[in-house]
Swiss-Prot record:
Its EC number is 5.3.1.24. CDD domains: PRAI. It catalyses: N-(5-phospho-beta-D-ribosyl)anthranilate = 1-(2-carboxyphenylamino)-1-deoxy-D-ribulose 5-phosphate. It comes from Bordetella avium (strain 197N). GO terms for molecular function: phosphoribosylanthranilate isomerase activity. This is N-(5'-phosphoribosyl)anthranilate isomerase. Keywords: Amino-acid biosynthesis, Aromatic amino acid biosynthesis, Isomerase, Tryptophan biosynthesis. The keyword Nucleus does not apply. It holds the Pfam family PRAI. One of its GO terms (biological process) is L-tryptophan biosynthetic process.
Amino acid sequence: MRTRVKICGLTREADIAQAIEAGVDAIGLICYAGSKRYVDLARAARLRREVPAFVSVVTLFVNPAPDEVRAVLDHVGPDLLQFHGDESPEDCTRYGHRFMRAFRVGAAGLDSAGAIAAACRPYHEAAGWLFDSYSSGYGGSGLTFDHSLLAEVQADAGSRPLVLAGGLNPDNIAQALALVQPWAVDVSSGVESGPGLKSADKMKEFLKRIKKVDDDLHA
């Protein structure tokens, strides 16, 4: 099995083209106005049109109003919704669309292996559980966390995909994959030259190192 890769926080057409050339499986568009990588509805729709078949588009929200999500569904047409705030299971399922729920490891109530596993269980309809590190603001933190805290979640997850995020970059991805072996990884700032400005070289190197780990693990 190979590790799937999502690059999040894309804001430019050229970056999408370079991410696809590097071999990414999914791209993330941030629909949360509090993020430095925010794209508005019209911009998100334009960027979505740059994505070819067989590459997924994920739109990220943080505690959105229902009308915001419905507008994105209507005008952008994402393959997957990503909820990265305090959304309840009902908040996530109300749209009848596939979704992924993010958990900020280290937040209150998410600071032990057992607590993290318990927090995930109500979201049994999610297409995946994503694990990021906690920071005082919402959205991606760019920080790493203790990956050993996911052991109990992995035992619980069954066939549900686990997505590892939080401070990943070309220099630390091999170690993270060796410990967790997730279904997918999600990266943003770790492949940037500045907020929302992706580096083609860093994206290529990130994908290259993931492929090497996958090849070594499954040789």
